[in-house]
Amino acid sequence: MSAPRKVRLPSVKAVDMSMEDMAARLARLESENKALKQQVLRGGACASSTSVPSAPVPPPEPLTARQREVMITQATGRLASQAMKKIEDKVRKSVDGVTTRNEMENILQNLTLRIQVSMLGAKGQPSPGEGTRLRESNDPNATRRARSRSRGREAKKVQISD
């Protein structure tokens, strides 16, 4: 535990002050206290904290050319993956209910899409409305099935003898 902070007050003799002087001094100190509290709430520095040295802030780490290229490649991959998912979703929605090849070709030839991708949605958290792709759903008619156990091998049965 740290020791309580000592505050030095100017030497004032209570005997020499009249009641009016003490009331005036109290009012002045209360207004100073209020002003200091507001300054602290606003994030301003008070006189006592400016004398305390703060920890030095380390300079930003320099970025090498290789690190820069790696970061660019990672960002591009994340954004491209997110864009591909969104494009697939929009294409599937636009051709939903199409039954003939001519209809499908006509829709795909005239298809225009606008998508928006951001790094916020690319970090693994799906953005709102994302993650509802057909093959990710629990629909039995989905294009992919859930992984199942191998049917070719039987599970080994272990017997423990006493």
Swiss-Prot record:
Keywords: Coiled coil, DNA-binding, Host cytoplasm, Host-virus interaction, Inhibition of host innate immune response by virus, Late protein, Viral immunoevasion, Virion, Virion tegument. Residues 12-43 form a coiled coil. Gene3D superfamilies: YejL-like. Residues 151-162 have a biased composition (Basic and acidic residues). It is found in: Virion tegument; Host cytoplasm. Residues 121-162 are annotated as: Disordered. One of its GO terms (cellular component) is viral tegument. GO terms for molecular function: DNA binding. It comes from the Viruses. One of its GO terms (biological process) is symbiont-mediated suppression of host innate immune response. Belongs to the herpesviridae BLRF2 family. Plays a role in the inhibition of host innate immune system by targeting the CGAS enzymatic activity which is the principal cytosolic DNA sensor that detects invading viral DNA. Acts by inhibiting CGAS-DNA phase separation: directly binds double-stranded DNA (dsDNA) in a length dependent but sequence independent manner and is able to form DNA-induced phase separation in infected cells. DNA phase separation of ORF52 mediates disruption of liquid-like droplets in which CGAS is activated, thereby preventing CGAS activity. Homooligomer; homooligomerizes and binds double-stranded DNA (dsDNA) cooperatively. Interacts with host CGAS. This is Tegument protein BLRF2. It comes from Epstein-Barr virus (strain GD1).
